[in-house]
Swiss-Prot record:
Pfam families per the UniProt record, alphabetical: FAM110_C, FAM110_N
Entry's localization field: Cytoplasm; Cytoplasm, Cytoskeleton, Microtubule organizing center, Centrosome; Cytoplasm, Cytoskeleton, Spindle pole
InterPro entries with a match to the protein in the record: FAM110 (IPR025740), FAM110_C (IPR025741), FAM110_N (IPR025739)
Tissues where the protein occurs: Detected in thyroid, lymph node, trachea, adrenal gland, bone marrow, spleen, thymus, prostate, and peripheral blood leukocyte. Detected at lower levels in stomach, testis and spinal cord.
GN (gene name): FAM110A
Record-linked PANTHER family: AGAP005440-PA (PTHR14758), PROTEIN FAM110A (PTHR14758:SF4)
Family: Belongs to the FAM110 family.
UniProt keyword annotations, A-Z: Cytoplasm, Cytoskeleton
Lineage: Eukaryota, Metazoa, Chordata, Craniata, Vertebrata
Protein name from the UniProt record: Protein FAM110A
Assembly with partners or alone: May interact with CSPP1.
Naturally occurring in which organism (per UniProt): Homo sapiens
Principal place of residence: cytoplasm
GO biological process, one term: mitotic spindle organization
Amino acid sequence: MPVHTLSPGAPSAPALPCRLRTRVPGYLLRGPADGGARKPSAVERLEADKAKYVKSLHVANTRQEPVQPLLSKQPLFSPETRRTVLTPSRRALPGPCRRPQLDLDILSSLIDLCDSPVSPAEASRTPGRAEGAGRPPPATPPRPPPSTSAVRRVDVRPLPASPARPCPSPGPAAASSPARPPGLQRSKSDLSERFSRAAADLERFFNFCGLDPEEARGLGVAHLARASSDIVSLAGPSAGPGSSEGGCSRRSSVTVEERARERVPYGVSVVERNARVIKWLYGLRQARESPAAEG
């Protein structure tokens, strides 16, 4: 039977004018079937037509229930655990706690130590208190225990620092002796030998550069000294062993700054030295040719 068939006694559709009846679709003009009865679902329609496609009589007579998800029926907590969680815990009320009584003797001794002024003898012994920190405090004479209301707050005040002692003034000997440099100290003999060796090497190089000793002696000491005066002056204060010894003794009594100030800087470049050597050789040549021109 079609669903849209009207049942007898169903209320008819309301009367509409002709011009509206021709324009409205027919399915809108029909009233609800079975007086507004619910439309069967697809499962119900299949259940009604089961005999058409099921051959077994047992299956046709049984009704299939909708599938429901499996729910875990086991409780999350055991009854004992739930009972212990839900029931309020009854703890035994602790008895009246007894506070430790204050030792009034120790408290009074602390008050006396903080209130008493520090004597100068104790202030002078203040640096040594760190060594005897583990020693017990000196015993104080017993006093009658004061009442609880007489106990006042202990204010710990820092001890006054001991006055700084003035540094002893250095003696006249210490003031007169100059400060020695902390570096390596060389002996006088080592320094004099070093300066004399450097002076001898420098003098040998400039006096006999390109000349044999016999040829230099043949030219004469006066010509040699006159020609090489501007070159030998490079030796500075270390021109001979005697002067180096005197300079060494003088340098040993001055500080590092004065020694650096007195040191002669050798700022002569290589070009200037070569020019002086060429000039010196040229002077030797002129000194050699002058006796030949006079003879």
